[in-house]
Amino acid sequence: MKFTELTVTEFDNFVQNPSLESHYFQVKENIVTRENDGFEVVLLGIKDDNNKVIAASLFSKIPTMGSYVYYSNRGPVMDFSDLGLVDYYLKELDKYLQQHQCLYVKLDPYWLYHLYDKDIVPFEGREKNDALVNLFKSHGYEHHGFTTEYDTSSQVRWMGVLNLEGKTPETLKKTFDSQRKRNINKAINYGVKVRFLERDEFNLFLDLYRETEERAGFVSKTDDYFYNFIDTYGDKVLVPLAYIDLDEYVLKLQQELNDKENRRDQMMAKENKSDKQMKKIAELDKQIDHDQHELLNASELSKTDGPILNLASGVYFANAYEVNYFSGGSSEKYNQFMGPYMMHWFMINYCFDNGYDRYNFYGLSGDFTENSEDYGVYRFKRGFNVQIEELIGDFYKPIHKVKYWLFTTLDKLRKKLKK
């Protein structure tokens, strides 16, 4: 085996293997994204004795104190169950970094530590991947810890994932809780549609994202941040928009209302109606009243807000391994149409239609108590019967130890002065 720099083609061909469980940050498109952010990129990996790539990683070189911080965001990519391969990689990476002006290195691999069901009960027969964590530590890496909160300096360590293997949309939907099934069906009955946005329509996503940002108070990404991905990832970025055409909805309601009124009139015209028939008439009267109310509201809403209402939108990344929900927004004013539910249901079906076995709802804090900052997010994802995946976390290693000590000392001093 040999540790070496890789060409873009070598790197790209390797990470296309879905069995390697790679992240969308470890794809060739991210090279340009990082370069647009002002960073150099280097592709490092291992080749076997037949010159076949068996490990790869995309590193950003971040200039710091006359040296570089080497950061492989969600890398490296390899068969992490092969501890011998991981051991060799870490040993040879250290040698490389010693010769290439590295201050310190950060790795946050997309590697599983433990697996749980939706109720945080460990899967039977699964063990925590402590061997992998201990291997990093044996090479001088500091583990950032088994965190259970969001950290702006780190990628998420917990995820909610739908495993689609061996399932169909119908069998999967049966595993959802009653609220998820009910709200998806509501959206379908409303006639909510979903389409993919083009780049020149991306402002429609941003409008919903900014509204949600203001409502929820979360730390958001800039417009340029999103456009950087849109422009470099191409068809690996998917931006669905859930919307409703009120004109179509009003027409559908009117047709259903006419049908119910005709049925009610026909039943009323019969003489000597039984108790059972009278109950059916009473039920139809309730449905007619409801439909008339809905028809009036939809007609008024169309007049004031226009016939097309944008309900929810999201940014997704698709790679060889999965479809990953990155970020999203929705309109609170139109939440009765259940736009987010329809968007997720549409994208889950997209996975089935395009051969993906994983639909990743992505981030969770790891604190699953009712007082946690994202308990509502967890409950939403839990309702889809997700499996909870815990990743191994962040690892740091100083390479230029004297300069790293100075760097951390100055950083602590700056933080004290800010207080």
Swiss-Prot record:
The keyword Transferase is annotated on this UniProt entry? yes
- Per UniProt, the enzyme's principal EC class comes to transferase
Q: Name one GO biological process term.
A: regulation of cell shape
Any idea which GO molecular function terms this record carries? aminoacyltransferase activity
Query: Miscellaneous notes for this chain?
Result: Since cross-linking between the peptide strands is critical for maintaining stability of the cell wall, FemB is a potential target for the development of new antibacterial agents.
Q: Which Pfam families does its entry note?
A: FemAB
> Which InterPro entries does the record associate with it?
Acyl_CoA_acyltransferase, FEMABX, PG_Glycine_Bridge_Synth
> Per the record's keyword annotation, is Transcription regulation included, yes or no?
no
> What reactions does this protein catalyze?
MurNAc-L-Ala-D-isoglutaminyl-L-Lys-(N(6)-tri-Gly)-D-Ala-D-Ala-diphospho-di-trans,octa-cis-undecaprenyl-GlcNAc + 2 glycyl-tRNA(Gly) = MurNAc-L-Ala-D-isoglutaminyl-L-Lys-(N(6)-penta-Gly)-D-Ala-D-Ala-diphospho-di-trans,octa-cis-undecaprenyl-GlcNAc + 2 tRNA(Gly) + 2 H(+)
Which top-level group of life is the source organism from? Bacteria
Q: Which GO terms describe its cellular component?
A: cytoplasm
What does the record give as the function of this protein?
Catalyzes the formation of the pentaglycine interpeptide bridge, which is characteristic of the S.aureus peptidoglycan. Adds glycines 4 and 5 of the pentaglycine bridge, using glycyl-tRNA(Gly) as donor. Involved in resistance to methicillin.
Record lineage: Bacteria, Bacillati, Bacillota, Bacilli, Bacillales
Cysteine-cysteine disulfides: none
Principal location listed in the UniProt entry: cytoplasm
Q: How does it assemble?
A: Homodimer. Interacts with FemA.
Identification of the protein by name: Aminoacyltransferase FemB
What Enzyme Commission number does this protein have?
Answer: 2.3.2.18
Q: Which family does it belong to?
A: Belongs to the FemABX family.
Alphabetical keyword list: Acyltransferase, Antibiotic resistance, Cell shape, Cell wall biogenesis/degradation, Cytoplasm, Peptidoglycan synthesis, Transferase
- Enumerate the subcellular locations listed in this protein's record, separating them with semicolons: Cytoplasm
